[in-house]
Amino acid sequence: MKASLTFSLSGIYAPCSISRDIYLEYGDKKAECLYGTIRLPQYGPGCTPGKIVHCVLDDSLPFCSIVVPSKLFGFMPTQPTMDFCYFEPILDNVVPVLDSVTFLINEQLYSKLMDLPQEMQQIQFLHYKYNINSMETVVHSRDILTSGLCQILNCSPFPQGLVDFTETQLILVNDTEQKLSALKYANEDEEYALPKIGTNSALSIDLESLPCTISRDLLRPAPHINDDNSIYAFTDAETLLRLDVTSGSFITVSNMGCVRLVKLFVLLLPNGFKKRTIYAPPKIIASFPDCSVVTISKSNIGHTDIPIANQVFISRVGGWLQSQKCFQNIILTTLKKFFSESKRILCQNDLIPIAFDSSMADLNIAEENDESDDEDELGQYYKNDSLVWFFVTSAELDCFSKDNSHFIIDPNRTKLITTNITNRRPLPLSRSNLQRYYGFAETFYYDLHIFPYVRQLVNILETSFNCSQRGITLNASVLLHSTTNNVGKATMVRFASKYLGIHLLEIDCLSLTSNSRQLDSTSKIIGYIRAKCENVLPYASPAVIFLAHLDSILLDVNANQDPEAIKLQKSINFEMSKLLDDFTFKFPGTTFVGSVNNIDNVPSSFRSHMRFEILVPVPSEAQRLRIFQWYLSSHELNRDVQQKVPVSYMDNISFSSLSSYSAGLTPLDIKSIVETARMTATARFYQESKKCGWLPQSILITQEDLSKATSKARNEFSVSIGAPQIPNVTWDDIGGIDFVKGEILDTIDMPLKHPELFTSGMKKRSGILFYGPPGTGKTLMAKAIATNFSLNFFSVKGPELLNMYIGESEANVRRVFQKAREAKPCVIFFDEIDSVAPKRGNQGDSGGVMDRIVSQLLAELDGMSTDADGVFVIGATNRPDLLDEALLRPGRFDKLLYLGIPDTDTKQLNILEALTRKFVLDNDVKLIELAKLCPFNYTGADFYALCSDAMLNAMSRIARMVEKKVSQHNELTGENISTRRWFDKIATKEDTKVVVKMEDFLKAQEQLTPSVSRAELNHYEAVRANFEGA
């Protein structure tokens, strides 16, 4: 229900007072109090989480009234406040009791509380100081109890609930980081004395765009229903007082000779707006596109002083949407609705924004449907997603007035005439976020300090625009390319154009390729692009022509193709190059931008016409963190949510761990992760509400939701998107590696944990080569490295790199290293590297493909120690003597680690313990005795086979025992039950428990043959001596 609201200066946990009518309607006559949820209106879309409060009856309050402490909503009522709220009772007064409440305490206060001899005395302090009463007071996360002294950090398991001194754990945390020093109630520092009224006839003040539309319910005084809401501006009460005007009065906003009339309203507390700033809608901001500071002054003009225009001439502002015939009817219909629903106040040279639903264009709403109610019936289904502008060219008035520039458009008296098209630059993003204001799906906001490739594109577009303003022809063109799909090439172009205020003409070339291999396809494709752009560009400058998926129509000519196909391909390549030059030369200030996935497929003849090429990589860790923050922001989480419950995330979410674990994923994958986590949190929300019998005030996404969604995304899309996975092999799974482990920590752990030590120019060691007999754990060791240091893991096999086409094998090597750089920190593991990189000159393959692979591998390894932080290369081989000698030089595989056969009983014991740590061993098993029985030419793989055979022997022995028990049971009972039925109905846990005995190990050891003979072992030792001696 909607109730009148008054804020008091009482303590934060003072009971809220309610009038008798509310108490009688919702309260229990037997109960002494009532619990309910108070939700304040907000300046923006969606709804805010409500606060559960403890309410008491106050007979002195007027009808349908509530009094609430202002501190509960984090502000002091020094200015006009909101005077209504939404109240919902808690059914059956069931408010959950919290398990724990964490308080952040000032250092001095914390030390004094810790000096108290009993914990109960600390609870009594909170009780008397902040009026926290057991099983009565409702506390909320982030409540400020005292500015600079005490705040509630967290409530568990719900963000708000009752405190029970006998059950709720109260946790006091010392504020050692001085976070409380900057924590205050909003408006707390303001004096209660009013400022001097009318001290300035004009004020210089900041002008900013409203972030969203303001509900009429928040306008004080309430305006007339026919008032023009496109000229409403807002500011704080202090500014109104200094200007000596009341809320709802006309004022003038001026700068550099431009004067606009606005109706100024007060912003009610609480709100998140800045003080001494005037907030205006986009229509007013468009009149001051380059002015962040304006002069406001009191106006003596009333509504009756503004004349009504007889005729008004408006022209369309050039742009992509205005040039599309399919949108003309819906645009004109929306324009007509804009002028008919209110008496609009306009001025010559005004820009009028018109938002419309482009999906309604298919319904072909005609202009002549004046007397039809179809438009009103469809209005509830509108969801605006596009914006066009109109420009007021001139107006005809009957008479002169006090204000010669402004006039009113009366839908019953004024004739509106649309004329030609005019050119106007769009508003840059820094002046107005039009997508957020009108509720459109927002384009991701790139931080130019974190995304250098976006900064490069912005700089190119900005330079091109500035040069065209000075009459300098730059003819800029940019080719965006990437090695992975869905990295945001189109998004960055849309952002850059909005950020700078540049028209965008976007064409997806995939829609042009259905008949791209026919003889007349070239003329059709070129004709379509020319027709779409040439009609717009004369009235849309500066502009960006963006052709997405350009490689779908441009292909490099292959000599093996059909001659007709070659001719066709050369034709379209030539025509596209000519088109590029024509547009950039004929329309100064126009920048051509194309995007491709694989730049190697773009013909060199076309690439030579592109001035700039920008590589768009997979996001780095810092970039992924920013993307997670964007998609977990309030405006993104609550967009297109049908439910009324707001969605947010827990305060303890670690964005750094999310960004680290999501290495190699694209922005689209991160968006999918957040959507999956939101759905999981929503399902849990309704399940918990059914269990506890009440509906929490918000849906909270937890760290576990995001972690599970990230793991699911990596598992599902690892093959399709090429994202590597982190294996699950720990040091405990490997035995006898103490020396090798120490060497690995020095090589890998040091650069990861202390990168500052290598800033002086010292090169990192990024290459490790494991060599030794087969079965000694080289592959297992590489996986353990990736797991221990949380590194992504690429395993590369030799045959995967080979390709029948010339140059493709080396390209495969480049792709492997490129994927690793995109997924860093990462380990590239080359198993049996001697088959990939043998000595050059000794191979008999035609074409020398192996030699070229070795050369490419050497080139990639040379960059590992300098510009590839977090990428480590590990090779494994049984025959290091077959490797090309250049691989073993410093800067490449400069760390050679020999993984030999365990040659002592202790090492063999360590391996046995690692392999059997998950076994259930009998008391008679003595692993040290077993190790003494094993010869010293057993490899790690041999010990793995020994333990596996022992487990198999134990299972066979238990199977025979079970069969014997089943046979005895059938003889005693006369039944004929099967073994499966016996397990289902009669068997106990002891019958299914596999216990490995010493006899199982001894039997397995007798049957085991070593995989490495003594002679072979001597050969490997000789190779080791040769390498270590060298």
Curated annotation (Swiss-Prot):
InterPro entries linked to this entry: AAA+_ATPase (IPR003593), AAA_ATPase_domain (IPR050168), AAA_lid_3 (IPR041569), ATPase_AAA_core (IPR003959), ATPase_AAA_CS (IPR003960), P-loop_NTPase (IPR027417), PEX6_4th_dom (IPR056995), RecA-like_PEX6_r2 (IPR047533)
SUPFAM superfamilies cross-referenced by the UniProt entry: P-loop containing nucleoside triphosphate hydrolases (SSF52540)
Topology in the lipid bilayer: Peripheral membrane protein
GO biological process: protein import into peroxisome matrix; protein import into peroxisome matrix, receptor recycling; protein unfolding
CDD domains, A to Z: RecA-like_PEX6_r2
Impact when changing residue 489 to A: In PEX6pA1; decreased binding to PEX15
Region (AAA-cassette D2): 767-956
Pfam families: AAA, AAA_lid_3, N1_PEX6, PEX6_4th
Keywords: ATP-binding, Cytoplasm, Hydrolase, Membrane, Nucleotide-binding, Peroxisome, Peroxisome biogenesis
Family that this chain belongs to: Belongs to the AAA ATPase family.
Record note on domains: AAA-cassette D1 is required for interaction with PEX1. ATP-binding in AAA-cassette D1 is required for attachment to PEX15. ATP-binding and hydrolysis in AAA-cassette D2 is required for release from PEX15 and proper function in PEX5 dislocation.
Protein name in UniProt: Peroxisomal ATPase PEX6
Native source organism of the sequence: Saccharomyces cerevisiae (strain ATCC 204508 / S288c) (Baker's yeast)
